[in-house]
A protein has these predicted regions:
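Glycine-/small-residue-rich active-site loops that bind phosphorylated ligands and cofactors
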Residues: 53-54, 81
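Short beta-strand/loop motif that positions the catalytic acidic residue
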Residues: 41, 47-49, 53
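Alpha/beta-hydrolase
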Residues: 1-37, 43
């Protein structure tokens, strides 16, 4: 997926980073589909759908959400890791906070 190397932008400068994972991950990663369980959630969900995502494609994410109750989502014009940095992050974090303020009010 073209987005895969975007996670490098999340690593702090000067951080001693080991770019490896255990081989056992390869046997599970292709079947890991957290969105497939969204339908079973009993709590309110907020989902950020990155429309240019090549790691977790938006079309599949939207399909999972179509039958989910108590879900709110927003489409962002960015890739998978773009939403964690820069202006995409600023927009998304504001949306996350607003969702929390509405669904988990603090008195």
């Amino acid at each position: 997926a073209p987005d895969y190397n975007g996670y490098y932008d999340l690593i702090p400068e000067g951080f001693d980073f080991c770019d490896r994972v255990g081989a056992r991950l390869a046997m599970n990663i292709f079947w890991y589909q957290p969105g497939s369980r969204a339908r079973n959630s009993k709590c309110p969900l907020y989902v950020s759908v990155c429309m240019r995502d090549t790691v977790a494609p938006a079309k599949k994410t939207l399909k999972y959400l179509s039958g989910t109750k108590n879900v709110e989502y927003k489409k962002y014009d960015c890739g998978h890791f773009d939403i964690y940095v820069g202006s995409d992050f600023e927009e998304a974090i504001t949306d996350y906070q607003n969702f929390l303020y509405r669904t988990v009010p603090v008195k």
